């Protein structure tokens, strides 16, 4: 049985990704933050929930090491943890940037690094990190300075890791969604047409495809999933 990690497993996207991989025969290990009370109703024999603060480097490394000791390898990882904040240049202090850096980059790097090293040993594996338009395109980050800067480093990380993994079967991909159709966004953006947005299940489908054997020859560093948003 193949093994996948999904960070932020209790979020809208996280749950969709967990379900997709379980439905396709994976054993999924999902991370949640301490004191997360969101119920996760997945089959116990196919899903393992682990509480870990990915902002803490040592805890993140221990999580990966424990997982490898238990399962031997990891085939795919989908890193959905992150945070969001509004703010123009005038409104954004370095402390705001530091917070978004920690939420959006450190939480990804702390787990991507040990996973990357393990996958290089295996000579196989896919890591997917959820990016954002403001991180990819500065013009899309107007009014989201700290958030855009924090997310932008994810793209550079993927480039550097892919360069280091050249010649292996290890690929790091940044998935850039448009507006995601979630209850929270429907409440926050009234009057918009959710049909133009991207459903979490659609993102999960695309991620699973790129993790599957069908996409073994593809090495896409960035996947844009915008719909009409």
Where are these regions (language model features)?
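Catalytic Tyr-X3-Lys loop
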Residues: 83, 90-109, 124, 128, ...
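Active-site loop of short-chain dehydrogenase/reductase
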Residues: 2, 73-74, 119-132, 167-171, ...
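C-terminal helical subdomain
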Residues: 167-170, 174-175, 182, 191-229
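Amphipathic alpha-helical dimer-interface segment in Rossmann-like NAD(P)H-dependent oxidoreductases
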Residues: 103-121, 162-163
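N-terminal Rossmann NAD(P)H-binding glycine-rich loop of SDR-like oxidoreductase domains
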Residues: 10, 14-18
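Rossmann-fold scaffold of SDR-type NAD(P)-dependent oxidoreductases
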Residues: 7, 74-82, 104, 129, ...
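Rossmann-fold cofactor-recognition segment
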Residues: 43-58
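Catalytic loop of short-chain dehydrogenase/reductase
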Residues: 126-159, 163-166
